[in-house]
Each structure stands twice: as structure tokens, then as C-alpha cells.
Amino acid sequence: MADFTAEVFQNEVLAANADVVDAVVTVTAAGGASAGPRKGDAVAVIVIDTSGSMAGDRGRKIVAARNATQAAIDTIDDGVLFAVVSGTQQARIVYPDEVGLVRADDTTRVEARAAVSRVQAKGGTAIGSWLLAVARLLEGAPDALAHAILLTDGKNESESDENLQAAIDYCVGRFQCDARGLGTDWEVDELRRVASALLGTVDIVPDPDDLEAEFEELTRTAMGRESKVALRMWTPKGSTVEFVRQVSPTLEDLTGMAESVNALTSDYPLGAWSGDESRDYHVRIRIPTGNVGDERLAARVMLDIDGDEQPPSLVR
């Protein structure tokens, strides 16, 4: 299991009458999956758009989606729970035959590949229903480290924007999702909203021929993740966290994702991590003004790793 550290970088001297403390928190994981076994179950769900538009480009897109999904299935580690979802104006479980998850082994991979080979492209696009299908699959493994790949080539035209947002909100904290848009006709903002809220990535796959390698890499990365991490912020009475934003390697605002631990403490979920990762977070604390020469603790920053709280770092 990876070893985690959190370092705080800041200017500890404030101007007179200042009421804001800014700090950069660098969270680093080192050691990687080879350092120990993953705690608990892992889940991989592959969600592919099978709407009518996927039959375009003389069928290249749906063929590429089938091939990429089969490649991802082959990349899933033995013992990992998995499922495949087909998305149109509603979600359909492609594999397994009954709603639920199955463990990856030689037999289930062959069965899943066969089921995926029969997928056809027809229907509309309702991404929110696809996300909710993933959430339902995870009801049988609520504590698992869950990851989904979501692929679409078009816009969310078969449900309202309000329904999509409600589905995204429902899925926050339940699983991590990497979203990919195939071609150039998909809506960037829609997939960015999904990926940002679900602590994943969003990117374009311009050519169907590139999709198989993309799915393999996404799945391989997910298989290396082993820990759920949260940035735990404690502030003394009278001080408040104004924002928490990831600033490297990508830009993400985590402020609205805060989960209350108690009256003075909140957790900001950072998603699942593998070894040898480093991410930077800009935190801003609003404090009462003080007198020149006063020393004050603005916050304690801790990491919560799979439910285990680590020793704190101080924001002064």
C-alpha cells in the first residue's frame, strides 16, 4: 500500500488587519500497489454509448467501442468486481445477465466479451440514466473502491439538463468516473461536469482507432488505485474554509464537495490514488483579524486514508 504525506507551504506572516490565510497543500503518494494488497473490494464498470449516432462513420464507432470494451475487460485484474452497461435513452446491463456485479476471471471475461460483441447502436442519449445504473450496480458493494469509464459520441438529448445534474449529484462519492468523448460532436461541458464531480478525467478520443488503447490505459490505471483519500480540514471557532481547489496536475474546485465530520472539521474527497502520485491544493482560510505580533493557528490539515486519519500538518 502506498505511503501518503501532506506538506503545507505558506507565508506565515500576514499584513496588519489581514483576514485571509492562503496555503498550498502538496499531497504525495509513494510506494504503489506493489507495496501491499488493496483494502477491500474494487469495482470496474464500463459504460458505452450505443445510441444511433454510434452507427455513424460506416459503423466504425460502434465497432471501436466494442473492441475497446473487450480490451478493457481483458485488463481487469482477477477478483475485481465488474459489469458492462449499454447506454441509450435508458441504461441496459450488457453483462452480467442479471443486475449485479461479477468477479473477473477467465470464464467471466470470455462471457463478457461475447455479450459485448452483440451490442448494437440504436436509440437516444440519456447520460444521467447511465450514471444511475452504475450507482445501482454498486449497491451490492457500497464500500468498494469503484471506477467507471463512460464513453459517448453525442449530446445528452434524451433527458433534461436538470435530470442529468440530479444524477451527477446522486453519484458524488459513490464512484470515480473517467469520461471520454468520441469524435467531435459531444458536449464538452456535459462530460466535464460528470468527470469533475466524480473526481475523474475528461478527454477527447478523436479517432475510433485510438479508443482501444485509451480504454486499456484507463483500466490499467484504475487497477493500480488502492486507496480512498480525503483532505480533512479542521479550523478553530471563528475561522472558516473559504475554498479548497486542486491546482496541479489538473484544475478542480473541491469546495462544494465538503463532507462535514463535526462542527469544526470537514472532509474534501480526493478520489482514489495509486502510488507515485503528487497533487497540489490551494486552500484559503478566512480568520478573524488580530493584532500585530499575534500568533494564531488557522487550520490543521490531515489526510484520511480509507477511514484512517493521519497526523496533522498545520496552517499558521
Per-segment meaning from a language model:
Residues 1-16, 24-26, 231-242:
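Low-complexity, acidic Ser/Thr/Pro/Gly-rich terminal tails and inter-domain linkers that flank the onset
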Residues 169-176, 187-302:
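Acidic, polar loop-rich interaction surfaces within structured domains
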Residues 310-316:
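Short beta-strand elements
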Residues 7, 17-230, 290:
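Exposed acidic/Ser/Thr-rich ligand/metal-binding surfaces
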Residues 10-12, 27-31, 50-52, 235-237, ...:
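Beta-strand elements of well-folded, non-transmembrane domains
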